Amino acid sequence: MAAAVQDSRVSPGEILKRSPKKKKKMKMVAKAAASKLEDEVKDSSDGEGSCDSEMDHSDDGAAEADSEDNVESCEEDNEDAAESSAGTNSGWADAMAKILNKKTPKSKATILTKNKELEKEKEKLKQERLEKRKQLDKKREWEMLCRVKPDVVKDKEAERNLQRIATRGVVQLFNAVQKHQRNVGEKVKEAGGSVRKRAKLMSTVSKKDFISVLRGMDGTSRNSPAGKSPKARQTEVKSEESPGWKILRDDFMMGASMKDWDKESEGEEPAGGRAEAAASR
């Protein structure tokens, strides 16, 4: 019983010290109290500093009153300078605004000096183009000089005559080619199967043979042999030996000179003689 009585007489502080959870709570409470004390000390020190600064401001008040006059005079000078600079800046700004807001056409350059140079170059190019056009016009006029468009309605007879002459010439040419081929074929048959003779014969064939055949065709096409006298046939044989068309002769216009330009050729009759012969008939 005595031991139980002694245990009941133990103080509550000792009981708290014995339990670990209660020890932690006590530590947290002590820390909070210490932090509160530190905050109070800081607040008191800040109040003392503010009081000292107020005392310093009161001592400097007289010096500030003396310097206010100087500050006002400086401010007036600065205001005058600002007004003058503002006037110049506003004029400059107005001029720049006019330049920037000015609308220039697309054909002209924004820089005037370059615009003048471009205009000079354009004028030079225009002059060169005009000169080229003039040269082309002169060339076309020269090419079209003495050119006349044919009128089919008015020149029907002339066109028909030209067509007849063309058809006659083509027919005569093809007949001459056929005749020349026939003559060459006959000569090849006469030569036989020897290659040497054929080669020799083909080497003798030339343009002159074909031209002689063409000249003979020209002479025979003008006059047919049917119903002619032996004298006419003799003349035809002579004409076959000599070319029918004088222009195809090798010696055509070889003996002519400038003195005989107004004289008629030997084969041609004077126009008066032909007219008299026609009248007598």
Swiss-Prot record:
Residues 1-115, 214-281 are annotated as: Disordered. The modification Phosphoserine is found at residues 11, 58, 67, 206, 265. The modification N-acetylalanine is found at residue 2. Keywords: Acetylation, Citrullination, Coiled coil, Isopeptide bond, Phosphoprotein, Ubl conjugation. Residues 272-281 have a biased composition (Low complexity). There is a cross-link at residues 108, 179, 208, 238 (Glycyl lysine isopeptide (Lys-Gly) (interchain with G-Cter in SUMO2)). Residues 63-144 form a coiled coil. Residues 36-45, 233-252 have a biased composition (Basic and acidic residues). The modification Phosphothreonine is found at residue 104. Residues 61-82 have a biased composition (Acidic residues). Belongs to the RRP15 family. This is RRP15-like protein. The gene is Rrp15.
